Regions:
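A glycine- and charged-residue-rich anion-binding loop/surface
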Residues: 1-424
């Protein structure tokens, strides 16, 4: 059998979890000596393709960490690291490990086999990961199909990861229209419409109106949600729309002349909703209020915080003016240490000091625990000499021009003062 003829079992049955296969090729992974790249005669593992993340699982007792199409061939990357063969702690592939009758941990129940060409292997996909991806992808099809039929926009970008699904559309959609599309998708989900997968002939395809992001060579696989979408797609899908569960728009933004919409479906949407509910409950407790008043409370808190920051800034500025006035006048150099001063204020202070002092004017803001940021200026001397001393003695970072340098140093005030005594 040619390596290009790997049978895609996931095309035949998207709900199959386990399978048998023969290893056609097994080569060390070039990037990691604990991993091998394996080609099979048939596979249930869907590779990263069409913007969707690949299936995970076990193969021959070892953990499958990646599935890619390399040189046109589905390639499974397995990790042979000791103790790392299971589906990330999934109960169905682990059992209790006992020592002298006592439970000491968990161990893999999958029997490991030799990884070599010609060896027969048993494979098992991570079903939860697969099904969650199926929910996302089927939901995306309905959303994109509705957008296409209502607005005529194309889905020009698609990415499905474990945390979010993003869709890039070729035109701008208003927030109100996005909300309407979301509602219509969930209506379609509630109808529990059977999803159809077909392989039309070239003649049938010529007369079929369908969405496709790219030009497809060879046999085209069509996924149809009757009444909502017809699209060329290579990925596994749920059997009916009801299995999607729900679709929720998480975010949207204008992007490259169109709009990028982020969604979650099914159990991933449920988990996101659960997290948001937990956050809302915590905020209700913090503000001692109901859900409807949270935004108002946060807005008031933000305004109060900004007011306090302004008052604090005014007080610090007055204190800084006082400290500057107290600096010795009969010296060439000026050095100030003050915590909580922003960079612009510190720079303005240094700019004022260089008009009064002929040597170096240095401002350090911070504390011994977190370290200090500094700005050093001079009209008559090269500030890089001071920066170099701080760098050589204390590992300071930064630099600049002879008239002014800026940087940071992780050291105590006393240590900085010792270095300054040597160079000022």
């Amino acid at each position: 059998m040619s390596m290009t003829e790997t049978i895609k079992l996931y095309d035949r049955d998207a709900y199959a979890i386990e399978f048998e296969a023969d290893i056609i090729s097994c080569e060390p992974n070039k990037a990691d000596d604990k991993q091998f790249d394996i080609i099979l005669n048939q596979t249930l593992f869907f590779p990263e393709e069409g913007g969707q993340s690949p299936d995970m699982g076990i193969l021959g007792g070892y953990r499958v960490v990646d599935v890619q199409i390399k040189n046109g061939v589905i390639t499974h990357t397995v990790d042979i690291s000791a103790g790392d063969c299971c589906l990330m702690g999934k109960e169905e592939v682990q059992t209790e490990k006992k020592t002298d009758g006592q439970i000491t941990g968990m161990e893999c129940v999958s029997e490991k086999v030799e990884l070599a060409a010609g060896v027969h292997v048993h494979g098992k996909i991570d079903w939860q990961h697969r099904f969650y991806n199926m929910q996302q992808h089927s939901g995306e099809h309905i959303f994109s199909g509705i957008v296409h039929s209502r607005f005529g926009f194309e889905n020009v970008g698609f990415h499905l990861s474990d945390s979010v699904v993003t869709m890039d559309f070729s035109g701008v959609i208003s927030p109100e229209d996005i909300a309407e599309v979301e509602h219509e998708v969930n209506v379609a989900i509630s109808k529990n419409i059977p999803i159809e997968v077909t392989y039309p002939s070239s003649d049938e395809l010529a007369n079929l109106e369908y969405r496709s992001k790219i030009e497809i060579e060879g046999q085209v696989r069509i996924v149809t949600v009757p009444g909502y979408d017809v699209c060329a797609c290579c990925a596994p899908h749920v059997k009916s729309t009801g299995e999607i569960g729900m679709l929720k728009v998480m975010n949207y933004q204008n992007y490259k002349g169109g709009v990028r919409v982020s969604i979650l479906c099914g159990f991933r949407a449920l988990e996101a909703f659960r997290q948001k509910c937990d956050i809302i409950s915590e905020l209700m407790g913090i503000f001692t209020t109901n859900q409807e008043a949270i935004v108002d409370n946060v807005t008031k808190l933000k305004a109060a915080n900004q007011s306090l920051k302004s008052e604090l800034g005014t007080a610090k500025s007055a204190l800084l003016d006082y400290k500057v006035a107290e600096l010795p006048a009969d010296t060439d150099n000026a050095v100030l240490f003050e915590d909580g001063i922003d960079t612009n204020t510190a720079r303005n202070c240094v700019n004022g000091l260089v008009e009064k002092y002929s040597g170096f004017s240095a401002f350090f803001t911070g504390n011994d625990e977190a370290g200090y940021s500094f700005i050093i200026g001079s009209k008559n001397a090269d500030c890089n000499t001071v920066a170099a001393a701080l760098r050589n003695k204390l590992g300071a970072r930064g630099g600049g021009k002879p008239v002014m340098v800026q940087g940071s140093v992780k050291a105590a005030k006393s240590e900085i003062e010792e270095v300054l005594k040597e160079v000022l």
